[in-house]
Amino acid sequence: MSGRLIGKVALVSGGARGMGASHVRAMVAEGAKVVFGDILDEEGKAVAAELADAARYVHLDVTQPAQWTAAVDTAVTAFGGLHVLVNNAGILNIGTIEDYALTEWQRILDVNLTGVFLGIRAVVKPMKEAGRGSIINISSIEGLAGTVACHGYTATKFAVRGLTKSTALELGPSGIRVNSIHPGLVKTPMTDWVPEDIFQTALGRAAEPVEVSNLVVYLASDESSYSTGAEFVVDGGTVAGLAHNDFGAVEVSSQPEWVT
């Protein structure tokens, strides 16, 4: 690796497995020091042991403000500051709108939206003290377009996209950038029950976690120094449009002349 994140300290939520663990490993590989949190303590401790002195694991329920404060304090105490936040933690639940329980609605809002808000709020002070920062909110393509039966997930991911923009405007003068990443289907434990062909993608496959992590590293680095308030889509072409695969088999000479 090329050391693109040397001198930076990052905090990652939901970092014990899946995309979060991939983000942690990718940033450490590029020279960052990383504090990461989750509620999956055994898995988190195993990742921290693998990364040795470059990482610290903390228990972090993203709905609890005090645990965010403790995670930030760990980063500042252990590594001397905080420059990057990756709001990665999230959950998915599904159901028809008429049967969608209020408790499930509230739960997904608490984790996917309030958790992001609390994370951003917690890191502003140390990032202002550092004179710079990059906040990376993991949204989804469901933050760009709706999906049947994913009402809570879609609502929260759209909201994260909006929160990204309002905070980017507010924090920009302090040198803090805020962007959102919008993955499509990614091969993680949270989505292992989803058929890989559920979305018709231009590339014809689901993403590997590292393909999202590569974008996280870019946004954490100074390479993205003029990017803020923006959406970065990594979805294999899912939201680009309908993939009319049948058209590709039609001979050009046999196509009708369409007049509009």
Curated annotation (Swiss-Prot):
SUPFAM superfamilies annotated for this entry?
NAD(P)-binding Rossmann-fold domains
Pfam families to which the protein is assigned, alphabetical: adh_short_C2
Function, in words: Probably involved in steroid metabolism. Catalyzes the oxidation of androsterone (3alpha-hydroxy-5alpha-androstan-17-one) and 20beta-hydroxyprogesterone (4-pregnen-20beta-ol-3-one), and the reduction of progesterone (4-pregnen-3,20-dione). Shows a preference for NADH. Has no detectable activity for oxidation of L-3-hydroxybutyric acid and only an insignificant activity for reduction of acetoacetyl-CoA.
Q: List the catalytic residues.
A: Y153 (proton acceptor)
> What does altering Y153F do?
Complete loss of both oxidation of androsterone and reduction of progesterone
Record CDD domains: 3beta-17beta-HSD_like_SDR_c
pH-dependence note: it reads: Optimum pH is 6.0 for reductase activity.
Impact noted for substituting S140A: Complete loss of both oxidation of androsterone and reduction of progesterone
| Natural source organism | Mycobacterium tuberculosis (strain ATCC 25618 / H37Rv)
Can you cite an annotated GO cellular component? Answer: plasma membrane
EC numbers, comma separated? 1.1.1.53
Instruction: Please list the GO terms describing molecular function.
Output: androstan-3-alpha,17-beta-diol dehydrogenase (NAD+) activity; androsterone dehydrogenase [NAD(P)+] activity; oxidoreductase activity, acting on the CH-OH group of donors, NAD or NADP as acceptor
Under which name does UniProt file this protein?
3-alpha-(or 20-beta)-hydroxysteroid dehydrogenase
Question: Which positions does UniProt annotate for NAD(+) binding?
Answer: R17, M19, D38, D61, V62, N88, Y153, K157, V186, T188, T191
Which reactions are catalysed by this chain? androstan-3alpha,17beta-diol + NAD(+) = 17beta-hydroxyandrostanone + NADH + H(+); androsterone + NAD(+) = 5alpha-androstan-3,17-dione + NADH + H(+); (20R)-20-hydroxypregn-4-en-3-one + NAD(+) = progesterone + NADH + H(+)
For biological process, the GO terms are: steroid catabolic process; steroid metabolic process
Which domain of life does this protein belong to? Bacteria
The annotated subunit structure for this chain is:
Homotetramer. Homodimer.
